[in-house]
């Protein structure tokens, strides 16, 4: 089962929502008759913690901190786009905790997710964990970001990442198309079909 867990809570929320259409942009395209690609399921675990020394941080503050991580990603190459896709899913659901003069945001995504690839050579089979922590300033505000991810290959097929991205609050939170969100997170070489996202 796919669930998002709020920071400091044992209660999760399930995926809900309707699909939405997308249009081609850059190196992405939409084709109705594309092959399904090679599916690979993973048991995914992603933990995100953000701390900002500001009593009332904005979504822009969080976005700028995440953008800095996107540009400095230095983890496993084949795992990069998968982790970024999970980050896109998780950030809109981060919970908030006020502590003195700063705010802590956090969340945990856990579940079986299926990704589709245009070639078996693109399927990550090793170096499937990633962890980083960043201390920096955003608009003069001391900021901290911690990301931990682990993907374990599974013979079982879970919910496709395309369905998750379309069924969650992604479009509403980012107020943009899926292609533009991918561009923002520097997720390249992707084909978007009516019901799939294929990593090329």
From Swiss-Prot:
Keywords: Host membrane, Host nucleus, Host-virus interaction, Membrane, Viral budding, Viral budding via the host ESCRT complexes, Viral matrix protein, Viral release from host cell, Virion. It is found in: Virion membrane; Host endomembrane system; Host nucleus membrane. The keyword Membrane applies. It is a peripheral membrane protein. The keyword Cytoplasm does not apply. It comes from the Viruses. One of its GO terms (cellular component) is membrane. Its main location: virion. One of its GO terms (molecular function) is structural constituent of virion. GO terms for biological process: viral budding via host ESCRT complex. Plays a major role in assembly and budding of virion, by recruiting cellular partners of the ESCRT complexes that play a key role in releasing the budding particle from the host membrane. Condensates the ribonucleocapsid core during virus assembly. Homomultimer. Interacts with viral nucleocapsid. This is Matrix protein.
